[in-house]
Amino acid sequence: PQCESETNFHYDIPPGYKDDVLVDVNNMSPSLVSDTQKHERGSHEVKIKHFSPYIAVCVTTFSLAFCCFMVHAAITRQPTHLLPFFFIQVFDLIICLIHILGFMSSTSDIRLVIHTKTGPIYIKSTGLTFIILSISCMMLAFKAYCLGMVWDCYKYLMLNRRGNLLDDWYSDQWGHLSTFWSLLRTGRNRGNNSIGNSGSPNEPNTRPRPDTITYDPANDLPKYEDILKIRNAYAPPPYYCSNTNGNVNTTTTDAVTTNTTITSATTANATTTITTNANTNTSTTTSVISPLTTTNKDDTQINNASSNAHSSC
């Protein structure tokens, strides 16, 4: 009786296609149908036994933790806290791509599962492939869009942290990829739809650029390009122009005249001092020579007197 019920159950299943070959379940023997059903039930039970709720709880916990890190990074402007969630998104994108490739390689098995349902749905292989490909492309596009948003947020926080805000900081994003990624970027184009820009979308961005780049010693060392962008980094000293430095020239002339006067006065004083010293030396010499002359005269008189005495004797 059990075999008859199982056989009647399989008799209600409509015929299906597998690998483009007609498989009629009605023409199969009852023993083959029973063995096939037992094998399918056994494989289903093995799949259920291999499922562990602890793994699901761990994956859910880590996902929530990474989401909390992402929210904390966006609020406190910490770009490094976005990296765990970014890596999770990259891993999810790769896993989704592998699943899509697996579905595309087993399209015939999916058609057989659809045909063996209680409510039969007949669909061609081309239509099923198109539906699976469309859904897969939409899923990949959405995941890639979210991944690009997280990466843009990370770059914005890094540039904002360094104090080097640029208008076209995202211009080289996805530049080496195809046009498909450029279409995805239209939704997050901050150049024409930025906050505070009241112009039309076709007008270029008119946000004021920063005049100078300041360097905070508390952060890491600046780049060579940032140093070159600093105003008057290697500028020569200012030149003296005729239209703006006339007073400076006048002051310089007055200073030269004053120096000439001081030099003349110094020269005159030096000349007077030298003359005075010369006169003093002359007087001293005269006074010294006068006693010597007097002494010589006295000696001459003494000598004359002694000679007269000898002659008288």
From Swiss-Prot:
One GO CC term, this protein: lysosomal membrane
Protein topology in the membrane: Multi-pass membrane protein
Segments for region (Disordered): 192-218, 279-313
Residue spans, topological domain Extracellular: 1-54, 104-129
All ranges on the Cytoplasmic side of the membrane: 76-82, 151-313
Assembly information from the UniProt record: Interacts (via N-terminal extracellular domain) with human C2a.
Protein name: Tetraspanning orphan receptor
Source organism (scientific name): Schistosoma haematobium
Gene for this chain: TOR
